[in-house]
Amino acid sequence: GLLEFNKMIKFETRKNAIPFYAFYGCYCGWGGRRRPKDA
């Protein structure tokens, strides 16, 4: 889910990813189960 994704990004970037990715793309939650478009 989005929280797990945020934890992964925090580990990689050492910053909070939710403010950016919240509008960047829906990974899970709002629109159900979707794949990231960039990956």
Curated annotation (Swiss-Prot):
<feature type="binding site">
    <location>
        <position position="29"/>
    </location>
    <ligand>
        <name>Ca(2+)</name>
    </ligand>
</feature>
<keyword id="KW-0479">Metal-binding</keyword>
<dbReference type="GO" id="GO:0004623">
    <property type="term" value="F:phospholipase A2 activity"/>
</dbReference>
<dbReference type="InterPro" id="IPR016090">
    <property type="entry name" value="PLipase_A2_dom"/>
</dbReference>
<comment type="function">
    <text>PLA2 catalyzes the calcium-dependent hydrolysis of the 2-acyl groups in 3-sn-phosphoglycerides.</text>
</comment>
<dbReference type="InterPro" id="IPR001211">
    <property type="entry name" value="PLipase_A2"/>
</dbReference>
<dbReference type="GO" id="GO:0016042">
    <property type="term" value="P:lipid catabolic process"/>
</dbReference>
<dbReference type="GO" id="GO:0050482">
    <property type="term" value="P:arachidonate secretion"/>
</dbReference>
<dbReference type="GO" id="GO:0005576">
    <property type="term" value="C:extracellular region"/>
</dbReference>
<dbReference type="GO" id="GO:0006644">
    <property type="term" value="P:phospholipid metabolic process"/>
</dbReference>
<dbReference type="Pfam" id="PF00068">
    <property type="entry name" value="Phospholip_A2_1"/>
</dbReference>
<comment type="similarity">
    <text>Belongs to the phospholipase A2 family.</text>
</comment>
<feature type="binding site">
    <location>
        <position position="27"/>
    </location>
    <ligand>
        <name>Ca(2+)</name>
    </ligand>
</feature>
<feature type="binding site">
    <location>
        <position position="31"/>
    </location>
    <ligand>
        <name>Ca(2+)</name>
    </ligand>
</feature>
<dbReference type="GO" id="GO:0005509">
    <property type="term" value="F:calcium ion binding"/>
</dbReference>
<dbReference type="InterPro" id="IPR036444">
    <property type="entry name" value="PLipase_A2_dom_sf"/>
</dbReference>
<keyword id="KW-0964">Secreted</keyword>
<keyword id="KW-0106">Calcium</keyword>
<protein>
    <recommendedName>
        <fullName>Phospholipase A2 CS24a</fullName>
    </recommendedName>
</protein>
